[in-house]
Curated annotation (Swiss-Prot):
Function of the protein: Produces ATP from ADP in the presence of a proton gradient across the membrane. The gamma chain is believed to be important in regulating ATPase activity and the flow of protons through the CF(0) complex.
Family of the protein in this entry: Belongs to the ATPase gamma chain family.
Originating gene: atpG
Pfam families linked to this entry: ATP-synt
Example GO biological process: proton motive force-driven plasma membrane ATP synthesis
Cellular location(s): Cell membrane
Record flagged with keyword Transport: yes
Keywords attached to this entry: ATP synthesis, Cell membrane, CF(1), Hydrogen ion transport, Ion transport, Membrane, Transport
Protein name: ATP synthase gamma chain
Record lineage: Bacteria, Bacillati, Bacillota, Bacilli, Bacillales
Membrane-related topology note: Peripheral membrane protein
């Protein structure tokens, strides 16, 4: 049985830990509020941009753009969004497990796919397993701007355009609520979902539709990546807030259990002392 001193040390250590996890929970909650607003405020922009680009693409007649055309797949790209830090529950493990299983099912050789990864956790995961990581970015701020990911988004679109891979999938945690995040797979390139839109609005274009598509389609694809990153950041802060709340609750429960053990041990020690005193007094009579 642990001594009173040992139990007291564990109680004090657990109290300090609970203070840390509570502080981290509050910080994550504050970051979540802002990240959630950022993600939601970006949605109207994306919806309108998709509408405009879709109408231009549908109205282009016989003109086609490489980013809209499905071609034979020789190599697949995977853009995976993770975090730079842990302590976020299953936030990273869920998306990484999904990507890992998908790659194992779809591909027989590393030559058939390439990985673009955002976040230190994902980068470490794929490097340890010798997966072909061709691009990565780490150290993004908690509230990233488009400029923070402009370079890697531009390169990802460029790798599709130059034929390095023939399709690009994006994996990230979609924010549903503060207690629910869902791993999401989205086919980023080619942009086949645009031409599936049957609604059209008539526009007059200057310069030509083809020239406008050359500019807008890469920007649209880059914006999809940024939108997913904002969504993933909200999910990250929510997952970390929940994980820290659970850790704090567990710490409080452990403190209650240890305090009960401490009181019982203390009571047993006092009872033992009284018994010894009574026994000694009886021996003197």
């Amino acid at each position: 049985m642990a001594s009173l001193r040992d139990i007291k040390k564990r109680i004090n250590a657990t109290k300090k830990t609970s203070q840390i996890t509570k502080a981290m929970e509050m910080v994550s909650a504050s970051k979540l509020n802002r990240a959630e607003m950022n993600a939601k405020s970006f949605v109207p922009y994306m919806d309108k941009m998709q509408e405009v680009v879709a109408n231009i693409a549908l109205g282009a007649g016989n003109a086609t753009h490489p980013m809209l055309v499905t071609r034979p797949v020789k190599k697949t790209g995977y853009l995976v969004i993770t975090s730079d830090r842990g302590l976020a529950g299953a936030y990273n493990s869920n998306v990484l497990r999904t990507v890992y299983q998908t790659i194992q099912q779809r591909h027989q050789s590393p030559d058939e796919y390439a990985i673009i990864v955002i976040g230190r956790v994902g980068l470490s995961f794929f490097k340890k397993r010798n997966f072909p990581v061709i691009l990565n970015i780490t150290g993004l701020p908690d509230q990233p701007s488009f400029a923070d990911i402009k370079e890697i988004a531009n390169k990802a679109v460029g790798l599709f355009a130059d034929g390095t891979f023939d399709e690009l999938y994006m994996y990230y945690n979609h924010y549903v609520s503060a207690i629910q995040q869902e791993v999401t797979e989205r086919k980023l390139l080619p942009l086949t979902d645009l031409v599936d839109n049957k609604q059209r609005t008539t526009y007059e274009f200057e310069p030509s539709q083809e020239e406008i598509l050359d500019v807008l389609l890469p920007q649209y694809a880059e914006s999809l990546i940024y939108g997913a990153l904002l969504d993933a950041k909200a999910s990250e802060h929510a997952a970390r807030m929940t994980a820290m709340k659970n850790a704090t609750d567990n710490a409080h429960e452990l403190i209650r259990t240890l305090t009960l053990s401490y009181n019982r041990a203390r009571q047993a020690a006092i009872t033992q002392e009284i018994t010894e005193i009574v026994a000694g007094a009886n021996a003197l009579q």
